[in-house]
Amino acid sequence: MKTDMIVKTGVFVALTVLLSYIFAIHTTFIHITFGFLSIAIFGILYGPMAAGIMAAIACFIGMSLFGQGVFFPGFIVSEFLVGYVYGYFLHGRNVTFKQLLLPETIVTVCIHLILNTMWLTIFYNKAVSAIFIGRLIKNIICFPLEIALILIVYKAVSKFMVQKKL
């Protein structure tokens, strides 16, 4: 790995931690954050494996510094998968609303609703029914907002990169 990639990864890790843990709303079972923005943009720019690793590192650092409670590795797996999915479907493409629908659906349904709900039921020893409904409502509301925000940030970042010839 080249030095510039290490530096870029470090910057995005710091940005993801800030957006996921500092500028966020956390309750026991529902988290509303903006960390998905930096993970998606990193995936678009650098691909699935780099985005997955960056997201996992950010999750580990964020949980270590700001986590409430005991460390649980399942969420690191989830964050890796989020980064990987965004990178796999969006890297090297001109991102449009249509192209963003599939990865955002996979992230929302498979990772946030199914996998993370499973981690929460294991971690808190609660029934899925006690956790799922609130998470479902949150994800239904956040789904279109996340797509819109990713598109807005992507357009701004790509415009900046073209201007600066990055």
Describe the predicted segments one by one:
Residues 1-166:
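Loop-helix junctions at membrane interfaces
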